């Protein structure tokens, strides 16, 4: 689901709490930042950028960058983290899911920006897509919790957030 759909469900009361990438504009909610999730470059193993130990965001200029379609916060967060404007990158194709983007990269169509947590979750086939970090560690997004401001469960949600923060290295 797109983030806006999840936030709408939160406002309707269909969901009590969300784990999502921040910031995301929403009214009448509280948020709690949990951790930073670095972006990594995903590229075909024979791509020139895959041969490097670490990259600069400027290395992305002129590359065929495969991203999710407009409306997905991952797209906006990835571009923002790399301090890139839409006009600075070539986006020949867009996809509706991260797994589709990864398959397009594996097919040699271009490169992409992958959240580290997705890579750790096994979204990327290791033999078909090479993953390279960026220098400096500041190419990342924030992951956090969001809940309705007037919920009677705020204390529980903050405790959940504290638990996640305290155990994130083991996740």
Model segments located where?
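Short beta-strand-centered segments that line the small-molecule binding cleft or hinge
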Residues: 2-39, 43, 80, 106-109, ...
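Short secondary-structure boundary segments
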Residues: 22-23, 45, 116-118, 143, ...
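Short Pro/Gly-enriched coil loops immediately N-terminal to beta-strands
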Residues: 29-45, 53-61, 134-143
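Secondary-structure junction motif
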Residues: 64-85, 153-161, 168-171
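A local structural motif
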Residues: 83-92, 128
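A late-sequence structural motif
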Residues: 129-171
């Amino acid at each position: 689901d797109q983030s806006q759909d999840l936030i709408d469900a939160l406002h309707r009361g269909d969901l009590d709490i969300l784990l999502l990438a921040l910031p995301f504009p929403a009214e009448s909610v509280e948020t709690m930042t949990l951790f930073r999730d670095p972006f990594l470059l995903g590229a075909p193993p024979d791509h020139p950028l895959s041969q490097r130990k670490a990259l600069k965001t400027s290395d992305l200029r002129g590359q065929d960058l495969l991203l999710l379609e407009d409306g997905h916060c991952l797209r906006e967060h990835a571009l923002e983290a790399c301090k890139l404007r839409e006009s600075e990158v070539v986006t020949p194709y867009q996809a509706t899911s991260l797994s589709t983007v990864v398959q397009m990269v594996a097919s040699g169509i271009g490169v992409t920006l992958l959240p580290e947590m997705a890579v750790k979750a096994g979204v990327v086939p290791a033999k078909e897509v090479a993953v390279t970090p960026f220098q400096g560690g500041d190419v990342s997004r924030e992951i956090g919790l969001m809940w309705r401001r007037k919920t009677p469960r705020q204390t529980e949600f903050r405790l959940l957030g504290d638990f996640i923060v305290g155990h994130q290295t083991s996740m």
